[in-house]
C-alpha cells in the first residue's frame, strides 16, 4: 500500500496528539490563506462553491470536516453542540442549540494551493432565500444527499434553483455508515426524479457498520481513511470481491460521460480506451455544461470520503473565468429592451469594478454587506456607487469572513467574495466604481411570503427594541415582510413558513431582549376572477377651476394557473385618446386597487388589465385623474365578475415506519391532501402529497402522535389554486365578522 500523510504518521510516532497535529497543520495553512489573500491569485487557483441539501443530510458536518482537513480549524465539533461548542459554521446561538443552519455562513480555505470560498447553506425549506442568494453568486456547488433518504423535498427545490442560475455541481452521497443506507437507490432517484445524467465516480467498500472506504473508479484503486480523525489517506489495491463490480461501474461511468461529451463519445465509438487524463477532462467538460453529474460517496461524521471530494472540487468545478456572468445595462430612455454586458473575469484593475451585494448581516462587527466581485478591483479606501440609489460610499474596511470571524484584506478582485462595513444598501444591489454607469447584475429571485402572524412586544416599553430588530431583519432577509394593519392596529410579519417566523420571534428575544406575543398564523389567501369581464369607466370631478377627467375602456382577464401570483398590465391603445404619458398612471391605479379584494380583503392576483381605449380632456386630465380611473375600472369589473379565493398549496413529504402508513394517509386525506406519489426503503415509507397550507397547522403534533414520534415531514410552497367551497365560505365569513359587514349575498362567490 502507498501511504499518504507521512508527516502525520511521524508526528503520531513521536507521541503527539492528533489534535495538536491538526493545530500544527492549521497554523501552516492559515498563513497560506493570509499570504494568498493579499497577493493576486490567478483564476485557476480559485473556486467559489456552495454546499446545499435537504435538512439533516449532513451539510454543516461536511463543511466542518473540510475546514479541519484543510487546516482552517484545529478541532472538529458536533453540529448540535453536544460538546458545548457546536459547529464552527453555525455561529448563531440559536443555530447551535437547534442543530440547523439558519444563515449561510461564508468562509474560505486552501486545498492544494487552491483558494476555496465556501458558503454553507440552510437545508430547511423556510430558509430557501439563503440558498438562492448563495447559488446566485457562486460558480459551482456540492449537492449533499443522505444515503438513506435519497432525493427529498428540499433536494428538488435546490435542484430547481441550481438550474435557474445554471450552476454546475457535484453530488456527495453522505451517511453511508447509517442503517438502511442505499447509494444505488439515491443514484436512481437522481436519474428519475431530478432527470440527471448521473453516475458513480466511486463505489463503497462495505455499507452501514461495515463501511471501510471507497473505490476510485477513475484511478482504479481503493482509498482508506485512517487515524483518529480520518486524516491519513491510504491507497491500495481494489479488494478481489469488488473488482468485477468496479469494472462494471467504471464502464457505466464512461458510457454516461460519452453520451454528454463529444470527444469522449468519438473515442467510445472508435473503441479506443480513454486514458485517466482523457476521462477527467471529459468529466470536467460535461460537468461544466451541466450535462453530467459526478457522484461521490462517504460519511462526513465518520471522516470518510471528504479529501477525495475536495480533490474533485478542484478537478471538476469551474474557476471564475470559466463562468459567464452578465450585467444588465439599464438605458435612460426606460425602454424594455435590456442590453447584457459580459463581465471580464481578469483579476486586475483593467476594467471598472462591478459587484453584487447578496447578503446583509448585523453582527458583532456592525453592519456587514457580503459582496461578490464580478469585474475589476476593489481596494480599501475606494469610493463606490450603489446603482439603485445612486449613493456613493467610501470603503473604510474590507474583510474576508470565516463564519463569524473575520480577516482584513487590502484588495479584492473579480471572483472574490468579501465583506464591506457600514454600507447602506439592500440585498440584490449592484455596486460600481463609476457614477451613473446604469449597470446592474440580474436580481436575486425572491419568492413571495405564504404565511403571516400578528406580533407585538410583551412589554410596551420594548417598542423601540422591537422596531429596531424588525427593521434589521427586513433589511437582511427579503422574504421577511412587515406591515402595519391599520384596521386592527397590529404589526403583521410574513415569511416562508412557521419555523421562519418562529426563529425571528426567538431572535428578537435573544438579541434585543424583547420577548414577543404572537397571534395565530394566517395564510396568504389571494382573490382572482374566473372569466374575462369588460369595463368602461369614467372618472370625473368638477369643483371649480381645473377638475379631474379620465376615461378607460378595456377588459379584465384571468391569468393561467401557473401565473396566479402575478399581476399584468397590457396597453393596447391606438392613437391619442389616452396620451401615452397617462398610461403608467392607469397601471398604478390598477396595482394600488389590487391590494385589497372585495371578497375577503386579501390581495388580488392572477389578473391581466387590458387597456383598449379611453378618453381625456385637454384641461382637466392629469396623472391623478387616470390613477383614479384605473382604480375605478378595476372595481367596476370586479362588481360584475365571478370571484374565487386562491390558497397556497404545499408539496408535503412524510417519512414514517411502514406500520403507520394507514394512519398517515388518513391524516393527509383529512387535511384535503392529494397524494402524488409513494416511495419506500427498508421499514420506512415516503408519502408525497399536495396539501393546502391552511390545513397544515398542527400537523407536526398529529404526526408525532400517530407514529409514536417516529414520523417526520417537510413541506415547501408549490403553487396557488382555488380553494374548496367550504374553505372559501369560512374565509369570507371571518372577514365579514371582522369588519362588521352584513352577510355576503348569495351568488357573489363561486361555489
UniProtKB/Swiss-Prot annotation:
InterPro entries: EFG_II (IPR041095), EFG_III (IPR009022), EFG_III/V (IPR035647), EFG_IV (IPR047872), EFG_V (IPR035649), EFG_V-like (IPR000640), EFTu-like_2 (IPR004161), G_TR_CS (IPR031157)
Enzymatic reactions: GTP + H2O = GDP + phosphate + H(+)
SMART domains assigned to the protein according to its UniProt record, in alphabetical order: EFG_C (SM00838), EFG_IV (SM00889)
CDD domains: EF-G, EFG_III, EFG_mtEFG1_IV, mtEFG1_C, mtEFG1_II_like
Modified residues (Phosphoserine): 91
Pathway: Protein biosynthesis; polypeptide chain elongation
Location of the tr-type G domain: 44-321
EC numbers: 3.6.5.-
Alphabetical keyword list: Acetylation, Elongation factor, GTP-binding, Hydrolase, Mitochondrion, Nucleotide-binding, Phosphoprotein, Protein biosynthesis, Transit peptide
Organelle transit peptide: 1-36
Methyltransferase listed as a keyword: no
Sites bearing N6-acetyllysine, chain numbering: 175
GO molecular function ontology, one term from the record: GTP binding
Database matches in Pfam families: EFG_C (PF00679), EFG_III (PF14492), EFG_IV (PF03764), GTP_EFTU (PF00009), GTP_EFTU_D2 (PF03144)
Subcellular location: Mitochondrion
Ligand binding (GTP): 53-60, 120-124, 174-177
Highest taxon, organism lineage: Eukaryota
GO BP term (any one): mitochondrial translational elongation
GO CC term (a single one): mitochondrion
UniProt xrefs under PANTHER family: ELONGATION FACTOR G, MITOCHONDRIAL (PTHR43636:SF2)
Annotated family: Belongs to the TRAFAC class translation factor GTPase superfamily. Classic translation factor GTPase family. EF-G/EF-2 subfamily.
Function (record text): Mitochondrial GTPase that catalyzes the GTP-dependent ribosomal translocation step during translation elongation. During this step, the ribosome changes from the pre-translocational (PRE) to the post-translocational (POST) state as the newly formed A-site-bound peptidyl-tRNA and P-site-bound deacylated tRNA move to the P and E sites, respectively. Catalyzes the coordinated movement of the two tRNA molecules, the mRNA and conformational changes in the ribosome. Does not mediate the disassembly of ribosomes from messenger RNA at the termination of mitochondrial protein biosynthesis.
Protein name: Elongation factor G, mitochondrial
Gene that encodes the chain: GFM1
